[in-house]
Amino acid sequence: MFQLEQLSIAIIGLGYVGLPLAVEFGKQKPTLGFDINQQRIAELLAGHDHTLETSAEELKQALNLRYTHDFTALKQSNFFIVTVPTPIDDFKQPDLTPLIKSSETIGQVLKKGDIVVYELSLIHI
């Protein structure tokens, strides 16, 4: 089990759930925000969030938050929080592709003892 000071946090998916979570963690602890969308990473590095989930001021306050689209940077982390979308398909079933792909990505860098937390929002219609 990790001591709190040993945690190296990575947030996977910087959407409406992941970015605010990464910002709050990044105000307190070293945190890596990962997203496969290079444009998303570029805008966050420029201090802008087009989704308006966080303000420019909040982004500035997260002094311990780094952003990347390079999955190899995840090797430094030992606590992963996955916040990828689970959209509904034409048959009103959740599309788990983003969840599966992010799990495969983490699996490439996962070490014994690492922790993975999944935060999923599923809408049943």
Please report, for each region that a protein language model flagged, where it lies by residue.
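Glycine-rich Rossmann-fold phosphate-binding loop(s) that bind the pyrophosphate
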Residues: L14
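Conserved small/polar residues in nucleotide/adenosyl-binding loops
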Residues: I123-I125
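Aromatic pocket-lining residues of Rossmann-like dinucleotide-binding sites
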Residues: F25
